[in-house]
């Protein structure tokens, strides 16, 4: 025991021996309680101050001992400490019993009110390691496994076609993309790191696309909206139409105009073709080619234009009417009466039937009436009052309505491998035509209508489906003024749908399933 410790014990013993009899005397005397309590409080305060001074002296000695000790001594944390006395000293149990002196590894522990350093000082917390995607170089004939997120956008777009369950883009993910093999002379990790692929103009925020759009439709829409333009090809069409060759083709999945797929770029006034494509899919007709709206950098005006997928499987048309089947209005009315190829019946030669199935004319008439497309069945504009800007007026065809039976139909197109069904092209519609000027000549001779389309028109879900479908095409949605502008177009279609239902009921036309 050191000298300061002995001195502290002597002082404690002396104070207790002097104060004890005086405290008893004060307690038993007849002094006022207020004065007695004051004396007791003063004595306790003096003794408490003495104890605090002793503890402070011990803390000072502990600080000096810590500074003199070795900093890297790790054995001090292995000594068990059963209790901490108030006088600041600490000794192992065996040294307290036999009175032996402390060993040099004495530890002093004091309570501090505030930490001078943070709990986790620098160097004690293991930092998080960032992921590194470096890929080692390989030999020319070797292969490297690369995660899909590290593949360059050009390589990823080309490889996506090999995965049938995946829809390319950020917004829809039908299935998990597997690992793929990359072939090449050298594959370096720095070249594979891409921060983020560009966002697609076809936006799908739900888990899947609308049910009326197939996976192939979505794939082709993304190709038209996001595919790089490789070159511009000459076309036989008039009106400033251009044929664009697109990159990112997939072998066998998209009909192309050669080794790469192509898109037919039209004028801004033909934007209604995008609306026509979505309406065709919602009605269950599936006769139009995929169409999207797009802005191109090489066009200076910056206005969005419709781009329609070019299908090389269509029967070429070199005549003036741009049709694979040359047919007049009079012949068309005779075909409607003969009901060619209905119920698998082979027509007789004297009927003059074409290879087109009878139900195809009903689908075309319904579709053209809703959009008021006159350039197929009424090229001379004989069923309504045309305007000066209409093609029939500009071409001087309006006076030819006296002999309508000889008027040739236009844009009647088939596929080479499927001549029974029609393909609707040049679907420029008109939304500004008033209800008292609708072209009912388009419905002349039609006695049956497709059940799938009529059921959608009668339901209350046509507006909801059109909004949901047109929202996918971001460029078209914004070009029409957002939802407010799209709602106005849908209002026109809904009014025409009610008029068509009234026409069907008034003329006793039948509604039949046409899913042959």
From Swiss-Prot:
| Cytoplasmic compartment segments | 1-37
Where in the cell? Answer: Golgi apparatus membrane
Gene Ontology cellular-component terms listed: Golgi apparatus; Golgi membrane
State the organism of origin: Rattus norvegicus
| Protein name (database record) | Golgi-associated kinase 1B
Q: Which residues lie on this side of the membrane: Extracellular?
A: 56-516
For this protein's source organism, the top of the classification is:
Eukaryota, Metazoa, Chordata, Craniata, Vertebrata
What are the protein's UniProt keywords? Glycoprotein, Golgi apparatus, Membrane, Signal-anchor, Transmembrane, Transmembrane helix
Q: How does it sit in the membrane?
A: Single-pass type II membrane protein
Q: Which family does it belong to?
A: Belongs to the GASK family.
Glycan-modified residues: 286
Q: What stretches pass through the bilayer?
A: 38-55
């Amino acid at each position: 025991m050191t000298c300061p410790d002995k001195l502290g014990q002597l002082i404690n013993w002396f104070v207790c021996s002097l104060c004890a009899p005086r405290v008893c005397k004060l307690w038993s005397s007849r002094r006022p309680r207020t004065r007695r309590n004051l004396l007791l409080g003063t004595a306790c305060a003096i003794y408490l101050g003495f104890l605090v001074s002793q503890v402070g002296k011990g803390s000072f000695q502990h600080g000096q001992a810590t500074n003199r000790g070795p900093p890297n001594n790790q054995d001090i944390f292995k000594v068990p400490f059963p209790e901490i006395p108030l006088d600041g000293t600490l000794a192992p149990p065996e040294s307290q019993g036999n009175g032996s002196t402390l060993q040099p590894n004495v530890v002093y522990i004091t309570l501090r009110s505030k930490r001078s350093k943070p709990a986790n000082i620098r160097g004690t917390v293991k930092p998080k390691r960032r992921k590194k995607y470096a890929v080692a170089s390989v030999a020319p004939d070797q292969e490297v496994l690369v995660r899909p997120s590290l593949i360059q956008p050009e390589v990823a777009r080309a490889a996506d076609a090999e995965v049938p369950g995946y829809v390319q883009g950020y917004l829809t993910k039908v299935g998990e993309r597997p690992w793929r093999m990359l072939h090449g002379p050298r594959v370096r990790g720095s070249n594979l790191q891409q921060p983020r692929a560009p966002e697609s103009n076809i936006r799908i925020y739900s888990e899947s696309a609308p049910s009326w759009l197939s996976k192939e439709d979505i794939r082709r829409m993304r190709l038209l909206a996001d595919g790089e333009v490789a070159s511009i090809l000459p076309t036989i069409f008039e009106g400033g139409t251009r044929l664009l060759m697109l990159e990112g083709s997939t072998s066998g999945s998209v009909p192309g105009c050669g080794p790469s797929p192509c898109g037919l770029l039209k004028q801004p006034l033909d934007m209604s073709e995008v609306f026509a494509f979505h309406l065709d899919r919602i009605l269950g007709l599936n006769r139009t080619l995929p169409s999207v709206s797009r802005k191109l950098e090489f066009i200076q005006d910056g206005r969005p234009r419709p781009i329609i997928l070019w299908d090389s499987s269509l029967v070429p048309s070199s005549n003036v009417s741009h049709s694979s089947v040359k047919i007049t209005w009079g012949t068309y009315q005779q075909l409607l009466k003969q009901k060619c190829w209905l119920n698998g019946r082979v027509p007789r030669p004297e009927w003059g039937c074409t290879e087109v199935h009878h139900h195809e004319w009903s689908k075309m008439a319904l579709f053209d009436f809703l959009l008021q497309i006159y350039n197929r069945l009424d090229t001379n504009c004989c069923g309504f009052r045309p305007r000066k800007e209409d093609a029939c007026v500009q071409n001087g065809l309006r006076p030819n309505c006296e002999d309508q039976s000889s008027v040739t139909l236009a844009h009647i197109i088939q596929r080479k491998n499927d001549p029974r069904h029609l393909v609707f092209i040049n679907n420029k519609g008109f939304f500004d035509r008033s209800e008292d000027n609708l072209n009912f000549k388009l419905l002349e001779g039609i006695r049956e209508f497709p059940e799938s389309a009529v059921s959608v028109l009668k339901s209350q879900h046509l507006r909801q489906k059109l909004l949901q479908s047109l929202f996918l095409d971001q460029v078209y949605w914004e070009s029409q003024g957002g939802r407010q502008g799209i709602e106005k177009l849908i209002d026109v279609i809904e009014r025409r749908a009610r008029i068509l239902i009234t026409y069907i009921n008034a003329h006793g036309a039948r509604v039949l399933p046409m899913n042959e």
